[in-house]
């Protein structure tokens, strides 16, 4: 897969940098560890990084509309994340910031590094381990929750508000004419 992707991207642009890790296959916990690591973000070039998982699609050519934000991803459904994913220090019921699905997300590299140097991605900082740890056996929380919630908790950069995030990407809830989607078919149910 690496050789195929590397050759394809080389033919598209010399500005695309493919980084190969020494993993044959990764699970959710490994993926979250990689993306939550300083090493990963230091290997990347540029100010803005588009995370594009293979189950994502880009529908429109309007990414410029979102460059002012340091983190933007599809909005989450509050009931899906409320008691499991929210940091202890913030009352999200009072805020319109349930944003951050990472499968298709645009991020400022420096802000990701600032989060990593400010707070560790451990269960003690989040509620996730109260009920889901026995089911998932995750050692750390999902990287998208770690970054977007930590940015808000520690005032690092600007996380896009929900009304902007829904124009950027869809996943569980349908919004008209987004930039793209991550597992967007979930919104068709």
Annotate each predicted stretch with a short phrase:
Residues 46-58:
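Short beta-strand-to-loop acidic/aromatic patch adjacent to the donor-nucleotide binding site
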Residues 56-92:
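Conserved donor-nucleotide/metal-binding helix-loop-beta segment in metal-dependent transferases, i.e.
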Residues 43-45, 64-67, 107:
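Short, conserved loop/helix-junction motifs that constitute active-site signature segments
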Residues 18-20, 71, 158:
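Conserved beta-strand scaffold positions in the cores of enzyme catalytic domains, especially
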Residues 97-189:
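Catalytic core and acceptor-binding pocket of nucleotide-sugar-dependent glycosyltransferases
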Residues 1-47:
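Active-site-proximal specificity loops/subdomain of glycosyltransferases
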Residues 46, 69, 154-157:
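Short, high-confidence coil segments that cap the C-terminus of an alpha-helix
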């Amino acid at each position: 897969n690496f050789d195929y992707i590397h050759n394809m991207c080389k033919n598209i642009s010399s500005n695309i940098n493919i980084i190969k890790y020494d993993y044959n296959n990764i699970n959710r916990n490994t993926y979250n560890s990689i993306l939550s690591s300083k090493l990963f973000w230091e290997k990347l070039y540029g100010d803005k990084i588009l995370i594009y998982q293979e189950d994502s699609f880009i529908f429109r050519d309007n990414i410029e509309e979102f460059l002012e934000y340091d983190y933007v991803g599809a909005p989450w459904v509050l009931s899906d994340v409320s008691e499991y994913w929210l940091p202890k220090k913030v009352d999200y019921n009072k805020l319109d910031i349930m944003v951050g699905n990472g499968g298709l997300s645009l991020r400022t590299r420096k802000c990701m590094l600032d989060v990593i140097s400010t707070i560790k991605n451990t269960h003690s900082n989040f509620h996730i381990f109260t009920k889901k740890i026995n089911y998932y056996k995750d050692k750390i929380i999902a990287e998208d929750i770690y970054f977007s919630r930590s940015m808000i908790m520690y005032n690092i950069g600007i996380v896009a508000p929900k009304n902007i995030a829904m124009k950027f990407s869809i996943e569980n809830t349908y919004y008209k004419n987004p930039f793209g989607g991550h597992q967007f078919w979930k919104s068709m149910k």
